[in-house]
Amino acid sequence: MEQFPNSLSITLLGSAGGAAKAVLAILNQAIVNEKDPIYEAIKNVTFHLVDIKQKDRAYYDELFPNLKEQLFLSEIDLQDVVTFKQHLKESGTSVVIDVSGADTIRVVSYCNELGICYINSALENEAVDQDDSLIGFQLTERYTRFEKEKEKFTNTKAIIGSGMNPGVVQWMVVELMKERPNEKPKACYIVEHDTSFLHDASLIKPHTLYASWAVERFLDEAIWSYPMYMSHHRPLYFYEDVYASEYKVKLGEKEFYGCLMPHEEVLILGKNFNMEVGFLYRINEYTTNIIRQNLDKVEDLWTWNRKVFNPAEEEIAGEDLVGVLLVYENSETYMYNVMNSSQVFHKYKTNATYFQVGCGIYAGLCSLLFDNFKQGAYYVEELLLNTESKYGEYLNLYMKDFVVGENEFSDGLLHDRVRWI
């Protein structure tokens, strides 16, 4: 905390969204818990909540009563450079938490210019999103463009991609690798099985796609991208639909088949480790079936209504399992976390998927505030491997239940796991 003033000022970008709601829910608990490591740091903090379309004051006061005296609301278009920079200066912002859709390179550049710390949950790039010639490869292009700028950020401490995935999953990978320090995995698969869905199926609305997080971002990965994985530090693509095939995942007694999708942590881990890396994801069966039924006309799905599960509006059944599977020659090790939306909502008023993201942001924020490491931009595994960050200790305060195990066999690499639909 030596580098921060006594009266800390934090700006939260994208404050009206689901990820920000989860971050604020955790901080709302932390600020009344003297045993929480962040308690002393935030008890007098000023939170500046920024969004292009801001929520009413009553929304925040009702959800986060322990913070309401410290919340200040602004409505700013982050493309308005002058207004945003003026906000950062006049508010005396020390840390920016970015869970918005604003261009990552631009926002980090401002923080670097002003010496402000930064943390986000995903990479965003407006130019890439608007370039139709990049359809199929947009996620990789966002990563590639950020990589070209990353080493320039030497006047900020920035933690990039500290949500659940990317973010917490990289911590899982590093932790699992410690168990076999003398063995090198053949592959690492980030795995997710999200069964969250409406408890009452009669509430399903026609021509509506359902997901636990931003549906448009899910569609980017699920229907506008090609299946991608990393091998020998290089991204490789299959010229086919993501939902044309799926891959076996076995975590002890749990088994499912997930689709191969591009994801930031695949690129990040595949750069830093020489092994096959992929993300295998299975969303709720309703949305899975809708996509498969429309593979010959996926563009039509963009015209459908989109609904993110909100336990405040309807009861949500199911759970979100996120973890990692390390593949060795004759065995596999795994680690995962499972959260149930109904249980999470009871305490934090958000769904399981967003709460997992919030836990990653909390861990990264604590590391920025308390851990000593040199300036620069870090992905989570770089922070863990190259600094004395206590990221895992902070994470375990709110994400407690990790399952760790071993399969005494190996299902092999991707080509061994595939089944065609």
Each PLM stretch: what is its role?
Residues E2-S7, K178-I421:
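C-terminal catalytic/substrate-binding lobe primarily of soluble NAD(P)-dependent oxidoreductases
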Residues S9-A30:
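N-terminal Rossmann NAD(P)H-binding glycine-rich loop of SDR-like oxidoreductase domains
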Residues F47-Q54:
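Conserved acidic E/D residue at the C-terminus of a beta-strand in Rossmann-like folds
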Residues N66-D80:
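Rossmann-fold cofactor-recognition segment
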Residues L78-K89:
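Conserved Rossmann-fold cofactor-binding substructure of NAD(P)-dependent oxidoreductases
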Residues V82-T83, V99-Y110:
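Beta-loop-alpha module in the N-terminal Rossmann-like domain of NAD(P)-dependent dehydrogenases
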Residues A122-T154:
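Rossmann-fold NAD(P)-binding glycine/threonine-rich loop
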